[in-house]
Amino acid sequence: MRYNQYSYTKASEEVMLDELARLGFTIQTTNSPKENLHHFLQKILFRYQDVNYVLSSWVADQKTDLLTFFQSDKQLTEEVFYTVALQVLGFAPFVDFDDVTAFCKEIHFPITYGNILENLYQLLNTRTKLGNTLIDQLVSEGFIPESNDYHFFNGKSLATFSSHEAIREVVYVESRVDTDGDGKPDLVKVSIIRPSYEGQVPAVMTASPYHQGTNDKASDKALHNMNVDLSCKNPRTITVQESSIQTIEPQGQASLVEKAEEKLGHIGSYTLNDYLLPRGFANLYVSGVGTKDSEGMMTSGDYQQIEAYKNVIDWLNGRCRAFTDHTRQREIKATWSNGKVATTGISYLGTMSNGLATTGVDGLEVIIAEAGISSWYNYYRENGLVTSPGGYPGEDFESLTELTYSRNLLAGEYLRHNQAYQAYLDQQRKDLERETGDYNQFWHDRNYLIHADKVKAEVVFTHGSQDWNVKPLHVYNMFHALPAHIKKHLFFHNGAHVYINNWQSIDFRESMNALLSKKLLGHSSDFDLPPVIWQDNSQAQNWMSLDDFGNQEDYSHFHLGKGSQEIRNRYSDEDYNRFAKSYQVFKNELFEGKTQQITLDWTLEQDLFINGPAKLKLRLKSSTNKGLISAQLLDYGPAKRLTPIPSLLEPRVMDNGRYYMLDNLMELPFADTPHRVITKGFLNLQNRTDLLTVEEVVPNQWMELSFELQPTIYKLKKGDQLRLVLYTTDFEHTVRDKTDYHLSVDMEHSSLSLPHKKS
């Protein structure tokens, strides 16, 4: 374990004494540090009748148990304090450590011994070995009452709301869109779990088209065959325009009632939301238009879908109506809401957070967009190519639409609406222009970057450098598209498409608690986060604060060599079938230099800290009238590296409240690996100038082009080996073209440029 503490805020002596007193601690500045520590331990061991037994089972140093120490006239020393503090946090002397000073340095222990008041205050804010902060662990065990009222410590709300007394209800928000064309505003189901509280509370909202269930069978049937040739496109200039959605006004009258009439049963939830509920934040789950128990079509990422989610925030602020059921006869107001909202969730859920932020809706104070899409084109396409998300060959937008159109899971809804839905889906297939891979109006209407100037909320991103599903380009573009005055924070980790709120190495959920307590509850604090919090890839459990993602002025340039080299596209039938059957086999052979590729290796002569998108400048020609170029850059050679999927450290040990929704403790393993992908990218040679320009490829005519690979942050040291592989067809991402052509690369006039921080 290694500590990386971002949620803790230094406090004045007056504030520390006051907050400790509110918890029942009577720390006296006139007492000796030893006396104050003894009092502190007696308080936190409240579950024990015989506190002396516990003290006798702990040690003060390698020769003295703690009870004996307190009964002696020995003074409290740095060594004794650290030994005791570590035991309080769940570490075992003689098992986890022998030399306490060396161990504190190894785990980057955040407390510096000196001021016992500050030391004990910070100790309560420090994570235990099993993931909870000490104060959260104590509260979960009943240290203070469940008063169903707010109690703050170090700027964070404590779990003093009973999750068992939470109100669970369902309402149906009247949206301002009519996506199914029936002349009525679409109703959207909202599942609510909120604290039992006499006043008003804020909400964390998860906008998830998956929440009401998915139609996996229909989605699987809509997958595309990737074993097709790359199309030769007609040269043209693509034009798009900014469009607006058509909204619909509320209809009819309804009687006002005070209570919701539909009870919410068990639902799937997000553990960050679970953590926030007993801390006084209502949890809202909204599937949106085209989903089970809601109305409308699944419009998949456009601003009609986002408008319906936005209207839930409008309802929380009194600007839209909600009904108790589908009859629309009884209206229910969100009188319990203080109008302040944060959004949460990963992938499609984080995507909707991005989209919602670009509406500038009043009441949306914070978005926590985890691995979210910023432009849907960049999810299913890249530089004029059809590209599948990593791990999902053959998926395209209509297969996602089929997956999330969960109205068809209700047989009656299927009978009434499936015919119209199929017609809608047929039109969507045409609009995708899968045969060309080109940008068009359909994709432009699902590009949130062009509306980023409207963002008013504070923004938190999380994203993985190894996320080849929602690639790092999405967060990079959104991060840089935000207006300069918007506060933004990026947790850039080394995982894949994963959550980070239950990782041992980073206090992410406590940081979100501090931020939301400040922004949604109005609690006064000095809490702030740096622009970028980056997980160091060169060692286990180490995070660093950075000023920016990209925007580097310095580049390291690597020339590709001399002469010309060829890349053949067509494989033998045997190899083609092997690779088409398992793209992982293709990847393994690609990285080993065994496919049809150009392989270039460099040994670094100095340390290199990459920050931003790598740039490839190529001079090449195709033997035919089309072609694609693929590139991957690897940290190559056996070494210990972070692996992208979190592993389980301890099951169900992180209490999200008070014996409530226990979470697993996870972390990225630091393990021996043969290589690591740093970045990758793909380009249709007919889009070599830009996305809106489709050009002719003249056979055997040299072309000069440059394109950026996926942005990343990655640290390399002197002596490390870089491997660049250039090839055509990628059996995981691109269409699997069988055309017998080759690319010739002019190595002398081609180069790789890596942006880096100054040494």
UniProtKB/Swiss-Prot annotation:
The family this protein is said to belong to: Belongs to the peptidase S15 family.
Gene3D superfamilies associated with the record: 1.10.246.70, alpha/beta hydrolase, Galactose-binding domain-like
Intracellular or extracellular location(s): Secreted
Gene Ontology molecular functions: aminopeptidase activity; dipeptidyl-peptidase activity; serine-type peptidase activity
EC number, UniProt record: 3.4.14.11
Designated name of the protein: Xaa-Pro dipeptidyl-peptidase
Active site: 347, 467, 497
Matches recorded under Pfam families: Peptidase_S15, PepX_C, PepX_N
NCBIfam families per record: PRK05371.1-4 (NF003783)
Keyword match Secreted: yes
Binding partners and assembly: Homodimer.
Free-text function comment from the UniProt entry: Removes N-terminal dipeptides sequentially from polypeptides having unsubstituted N-termini provided that the penultimate residue is proline.
Keyword Secreted: yes
GO CC, any one term: extracellular region
Keywords, sorted A to Z: Aminopeptidase, Hydrolase, Protease, Secreted, Serine protease
Main localization (coarse): secreted
GO BP term (any one): proteolysis
PANTHER family according to UniProt: COCE_NOND FAMILY, PUTATIVE (AFU_ORTHOLOGUE AFUA_7G00600)-RELATED, PEPTIDASE S9 PROLYL OLIGOPEPTIDASE
Catalytic activity, as annotated: Hydrolyzes Xaa-Pro-|- bonds to release unblocked, N-terminal dipeptides from substrates including Ala-Pro-|-p-nitroanilide and (sequentially) Tyr-Pro-|-Phe-Pro-|-Gly-Pro-|-Ile
Superkingdom as given in the UniProt entry: Bacteria
Signal peptide span: none
